[in-house]
């Protein structure tokens, strides 16, 4: 594994331990060069309460690896989380920089009604 990925995974592990200590529901985000994924995971870490990604049929028709797609995923995850009764979450960016697609997803989720 290269050094850049090891550093990202180390940051992600540290963040997840901190969120687990808080005992709150988390919005976990993962990205690949082509897609972006978001999950709302229960406080005990055992259940996915809502999920959205660029693989969803409603979002798949457009481009999937850009900021516009991440914004749509953010709005969709906020809508689905609110439908599941979740309004307050901790943002787990999986060690990725808070920039670009990650930031766009987070901003759209906030506008959709999720509190970080």
UniProtKB/Swiss-Prot annotation:
<keyword id="KW-0689">Ribosomal protein</keyword>
<dbReference type="GO" id="GO:0003735">
    <property type="term" value="F:structural constituent of ribosome"/>
</dbReference>
<comment type="similarity">
    <text>Belongs to the universal ribosomal protein uL18 family.</text>
</comment>
<protein>
    <recommendedName>
        <fullName>Large ribosomal subunit protein uL18</fullName>
    </recommendedName>
</protein>
<dbReference type="GO" id="GO:0022625">
    <property type="term" value="C:cytosolic large ribosomal subunit"/>
</dbReference>
<keyword id="KW-0687">Ribonucleoprotein</keyword>
<comment type="subunit">
    <text>Part of the 50S ribosomal subunit; part of the 5S rRNA/L5/L18/L25 subcomplex. Contacts the 5S and 23S rRNAs.</text>
</comment>
<keyword id="KW-0694">RNA-binding</keyword>
<dbReference type="Pfam" id="PF00861">
    <property type="entry name" value="Ribosomal_L18p"/>
</dbReference>
<dbReference type="GO" id="GO:0008097">
    <property type="term" value="F:5S rRNA binding"/>
</dbReference>
<dbReference type="InterPro" id="IPR004389">
    <property type="entry name" value="Ribosomal_uL18_bac-type"/>
</dbReference>
<dbReference type="GO" id="GO:0006412">
    <property type="term" value="P:translation"/>
</dbReference>
<dbReference type="InterPro" id="IPR005484">
    <property type="entry name" value="Ribosomal_uL18_bac/euk"/>
</dbReference>
<keyword id="KW-0699">rRNA-binding</keyword>
<comment type="function">
    <text>This is one of the proteins that bind and probably mediate the attachment of the 5S RNA into the large ribosomal subunit, where it forms part of the central protuberance.</text>
</comment>
């Amino acid at each position: 594994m290269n050094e850049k990925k090891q550093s990202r995974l180390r940051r992600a592990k540290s963040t997840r331990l901190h969120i687990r200590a808080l005992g709150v529901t988390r919005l976990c985000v993962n990205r690949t060069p082509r897609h972006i994924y978001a999950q709302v995971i229960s406080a005990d870490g055992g259940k996915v309460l809502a999920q959205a990604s660029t693989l969803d049929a409603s979002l798949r028709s457009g481009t999937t690896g850009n900021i516009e797609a991440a914004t749509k995923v953010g709005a969709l995850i906020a809508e689905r989380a609110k439908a599941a009764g979740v309004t307050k979450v901790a943002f787990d960016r999986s060690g990725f920089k808070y920039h670009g697609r990650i930031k766009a997803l987070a901003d759209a989720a906030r506008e959709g009604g999720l509190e970080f």
